[in-house]
Design a protein with these regions (language model features):
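N-terminal Rossmann/SDR dinucleotide-binding element
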Residues: 13-83
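NAD(P)H-binding glycine-rich loop region in Rossmannoid oxidoreductase-like domains
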Residues: 70-106
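C-terminal substrate-binding subdomain of Rossmann-fold SDR/epimerase-dehydratase oxidoreductases
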Residues: 207, 211-334
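A conserved pocket-lining segment of Rossmann-fold NAD(P)-dependent short-chain dehydrogenase/reductase
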Residues: 96, 175-189, 198-221, 242, ...
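Short-chain dehydrogenase/reductase
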Residues: 104, 151-159, 193-194, 219-220
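Conserved Rossmann-fold NAD(P)-dependent oxidoreductase catalytic core, especially the SDR/UDP-sugar
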Residues: 112-153
Length: 334
């Protein structure tokens, strides 16, 4: 048994993972966890939002930082890489709409380039970070076989990347696309331009939450559970994930925006006010997460209640704070 454990530890330690966009909101939580599990990590990023949180002494020897762009990075970055987690992207709808051409260049063409180069350079496994936003507007709960209705540049680019990258899978190259719910939670590269994070910030700073489109539907997932999903895919048998798309989230975190605000207020401070506003946002969908649960046994550990409390406590403690870098579209404009 001890011999088997040592063989397993060696196998894990010998694996190298390239994370594109590794200094982003999710990547900066994911990479320390990968290092905790003894993976060697290469982080490819433009570092628009800084790199301090990935330059800590404890990461030395297990982490290589590569300041480059997925659109033209040299193929040498794939040397010795076993797995690619492709998170690099202009990261939401408002940012995507700032420059539609650049969004397609990066989120579609750039990530397809990374997938093709991964295959050409002998990488065994490639994971695309996609988004459930490609469902757009749905009357029924959307599963992986539902028709997609991407309504924005960001979601259209994600859909294009899925189509092109999944065509590359074969017996030697495992390709998986993960359609993530809207992610919330604390990160070293903090964002307050996502629904839950923004609501908690408003509650903390203004003691009221503004809700645009209270009937609009969305699925949500805590950032630590998003990281857990990547670890699940990394370790899954390839016959269960090759050429597959998985929605990532939990059925109990499908919320209308109005119900989401109520859940956050009830979790943190019931005396806070909720202001309902109109919206021109036509995105509205719930998603099913039965596939990832049934095939891979993936379940989430966090919900809106304990997740929003963690964000609020971090604001109280001062470990996170609001600044221009936490509003992605404002930082790019700046």
């Amino acid at each position: 048994l001890l011999l088997l454990i040592r063989i397993f530890e060696f196998a894990v330690m010998s694996k190298t993972i390239l994370v594109t966009g590794g200094a982003g909101y999710v990547g900066s939580v994911l990479i320390p966890k990968l290092i905790d599990y003894n993976y060697n990590v290469k982080c490819l990023d433009r570092f628009f939002f800084g790199r301090e949180f990935l330059s800590q002494q404890k990461f030395k020897g297990n982490l290589e930082l590569i300041n480059d762009d997925i659109r033209w990075a040299n193929s040498k970055i794939f040397e010795g890489v076993d797995i690619v987690l492709d998170l690099a992207a202009l990261s939401n709808d408002p940012v995507g709409d700032l420059d539609s051409q650049k969004t397609f260049e990066i989120n579609h063409k750039g990530r397809n380039r990374i997938a093709r180069l991964s295959k050409e350079n002998g990488v065994g496994r490639y994971v695309l970070a996609s988004s459930a936003s490609i469902y757009g507007q749905q009357d029924n709960v959307a599963n992986e076989n539902s028709s997609v209705k991407p309504l924005t540049t960001y979601s259209k680019a994600n859909h294009n990347a899925e189509i092109d990258n999944l065509l590359l899978d074969d017996d030697n190259f495992t390709v998986t696309a993960l359609r993530f719910s809207s992610i919330y939670g604390v990160s070293p590269r903090m964002r307050f331009d996502t629904a839950v994070n923004k609501m908690v910030l408003d509650l903390f700073s203004k003691r009221e939450i503004s809700v645009s489109g209270k009937e609009n539907k969305r699925p949500f997932i805590f950032i630590k559970d998003a990281v857990k999903a990547y670890l699940t895919i990394i370790n899954a048998p390839k016959d269960k994930i090759n050429g597959q798309i998985f929605n990532v989230g939990s059925d109990d975190q499908n919320f209308t925006m109005g119900d989401l605000a109520n859940e956050i207020v009830h979790s943190i401070d019931e005396s806070c006010k909720i202001n309902i506003q109109g919206t021109n946002d036509h995105r509205s969908y719930f998603a099913s997460f039965e596939k990832i649960k049934t095939i891979l046994g993936f379940t989430t550990d966090y919900g809106i209640k304990n997740g929003s409390i963690e964000i609020y406590q971090a604001l109280v403690d001062g470990t996170i704070s609001d600044n221009i870098k936490t509003k992605t579209v404002e930082w790019y404009k700046y």
